[in-house]
């Protein structure tokens, strides 16, 4: 998103950048603690930090039809889902799941790339997938799950 700035492709004068790469939960944590000047965050965190940060006009990743998916192992009865792996407690994915399924309270933050394999191994009843996890879950024997409320 900021390739030209951080890789010296444009003249920034005296301005320099220290670039660090973290998963979204760690980025959210650092922004919440005020540890960064510029950071990618989850939209769900914005209300908590907007007094200290300004939302930029570019670099956003919000779209229609490509949001998180809720998956479980094939054949898992929806009413048996209790333990759910989420990509972070302050993520938009967790906020959406919490709003749709308020009865699920046993949520555990897991690195987004490890959620689908952990659900496939039976470590969690279900998981909320973002990024590439949304496209590979079927290969791991997982399926979309809807919980009856």
Please identify what each model-predicted range represents.
Residues 61-70, 142-143:
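Small-molecule pocket liners
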Residues 52-60, 83:
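A structural signal for short loop-to-beta-strand junctions that line the ligand-binding cleft
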Residues 147-149:
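Conserved small/polar residues in nucleotide/adenosyl-binding loops
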Residues 1, 7-47:
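Extracytoplasmic small-molecule ligand-binding "clamshell" domains
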Residues 27-30, 39, 47-50, 63-65, ...:
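Short active-site-adjacent helix-start/loop capping segments
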Residues 28, 32, 40-51, 116-145:
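A ligand-binding cleft/hinge motif common to bilobed small-molecule-binding domains
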Residues 1-8, 22, 66-125, 130-135:
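Bilobed "Venus flytrap"/periplasmic-binding protein-like clamshell domains
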């Amino acid at each position: 998103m900021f390739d030209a700035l951080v890789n010296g492709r444009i003249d920034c004068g005296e301005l320099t950048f220290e670039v660090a790469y973290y998963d979204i939960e760690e980025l959210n944590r650092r922004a919440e603690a005020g540890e960064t000047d510029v950071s990618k965050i989850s939209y769900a965190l914005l209300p908590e930090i907007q007094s200290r940060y300004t939302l930029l006009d570019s670099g956003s990743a919000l779209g229609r039809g490509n949001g998180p998916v809720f998956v479980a192992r094939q054949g898992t009865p929806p009413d048996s889902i209790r333990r759910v792996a989420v990509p972070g407690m302050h993520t938009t994915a967790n906020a959406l799941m919490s709003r749709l399924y308020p009865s699920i309270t046993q949520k555990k933050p897991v690195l987004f790339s490890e959620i689908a394999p952990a659900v496939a191994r039976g470590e969690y009843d279900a998981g909320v997938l973002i990024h590439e996890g949304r496209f590979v879950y079927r290969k791991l024997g997982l399926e979309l799950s809807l919980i009856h409320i």
